């Protein structure tokens, strides 16, 4: 049976500290760092929970002009 899981993708828009601007969106892990394999990404059961993490990140100091976020879904075998 396939179920839908959600992943947060991010892309840095400006240079900030050790971050350099990125051309493409990357899946993010639990700590908000880009991962090379999608299996290492942080998965969320609902879209709302993933969006809630983005909202918390925005209120704790990462503005929209610095990092862009997207929530995408993937069908996973269970």
Spans of features found by a protein language model:
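Short aromatic-glycine-(Arg/Gly/Cys) micro-motifs in beta-strand/loop hairpins
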Residues: 2-40
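Short, mixed-charge low-complexity intrinsically disordered segments
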Residues: 40-78
């Amino acid at each position: 049976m396939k179920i839908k899981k959600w992943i947060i993708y991010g892309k840095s828009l400006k240079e900030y500290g050790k971050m350099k601007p990125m051309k493409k969106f990357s899946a993010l892990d639990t700590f908000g760092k880009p991962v090379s394999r999608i299996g290492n990404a942080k998965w969320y059961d609902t879209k709302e929970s993933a969006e809630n993490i983005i909202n918390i990140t925005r209120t704790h100091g990462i503005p929209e002009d610095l990092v862009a976020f997207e929530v995408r879904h993937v069908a996973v075998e269970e």
